[in-house]
């Protein structure tokens, strides 16, 4: 039987690559994203493409109509510049994961993947230069540096509780600075690797010998 997957946030950078990979392995893919289709990073004609606001439970129900596995990469986010200036907006993404989990459980979906972030780690652990490699348990005691990190950490816990209470097969992955083909490189939503590459190219074109780098 052909697997049927929902890629929530599939119009975004990582979601677009995931949808392409799933389609390439013969999976029947539904892509749901809030952006108009002409703003999707990649659009796959073989997928069932839906423009939906997944903060709405009814939209989640529609997106899940033909799915038996969920990949949730949907959220309102960007680079640190975007996160710092849109803290409340980033927190709204908790509605997406809450509604998707609830609807998935009610519709009998057993497999659920949640895209978390390294932003869940405490602020003080990100300011120490002599720190050893982070472990999963280093997320606690919890003190993420911003609303985006708190939203991700809460959503991780919610996923865990759905595993404990309903037996759903839940997996969580904490992404860091992701970049590559089709990635954002300007406009404030880009991550550090892409932003630094852009600044270097712009500096060379402008004859400048300096670029601005955030953090220390």
What is each stretch, according to the model?
Residues 8, 72, 111-116, 171-177, ...:
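Structural signature of the Rossmann-like NAD(P)-dependent dehydrogenase/reductase core
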Residues 98-146, 171:
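Conserved Rossmann-fold NAD(P)-dependent oxidoreductase catalytic core, especially the SDR/UDP-sugar
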Residues 54-93, 103-106, 123-124:
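NAD(P)H-binding glycine-rich loop region in Rossmannoid oxidoreductase-like domains
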Residues 124-133, 157-216:
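NAD(P)-dependent short-chain dehydrogenase/reductase
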Residues 4, 28, 110-111, 169:
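Residues at the starts of beta-strands that form the adenosine-phosphate
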């Amino acid at each position: 039987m052909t697997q049927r997957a929902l890629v929530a946030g599939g119009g975004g950078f990582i979601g677009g690559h995931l949808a392409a990979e799933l389609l390439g392995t013969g999976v029947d893919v539904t892509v749901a994203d809030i952006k108009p289709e002409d703003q999707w990073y990649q659009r796959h004609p073989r997928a069932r493409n839906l423009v939906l606001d997944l903060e709405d439970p009814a939209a989640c129900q529609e997106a899940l109509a033909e799915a038996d596995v969920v990949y949730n990469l949907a959220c309102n986010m960007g680079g640190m510049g975007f996160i710092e200036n849109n803290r409340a907006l980033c927190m709204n993404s908790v509605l997406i994961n809450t509604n998707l989990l609830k609807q998935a459980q009610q519709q009998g979906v057993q497999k659920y993947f949640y895209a978390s972030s390294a932003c869940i780690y405490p602020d003080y652990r990100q300011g120490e230069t002599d720190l050893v490699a982070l472990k999963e348990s280093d997320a606690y005691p919890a003190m993420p540096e911003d609303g985006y990190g708190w939203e991700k950490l809460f959503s991780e816990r919610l996923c865990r509780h759905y595993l404990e209470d309903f037996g759903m097969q839940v997996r969580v992955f904490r992404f860091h600075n992701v970049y590559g083909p089709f990635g954002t490189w300007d406009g404030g939503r880009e991550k550090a690797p892409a932003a630094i590459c852009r600044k270097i190219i712009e500096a060379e074109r402008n004859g400048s010998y300096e670029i601005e780098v955030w953090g220390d």
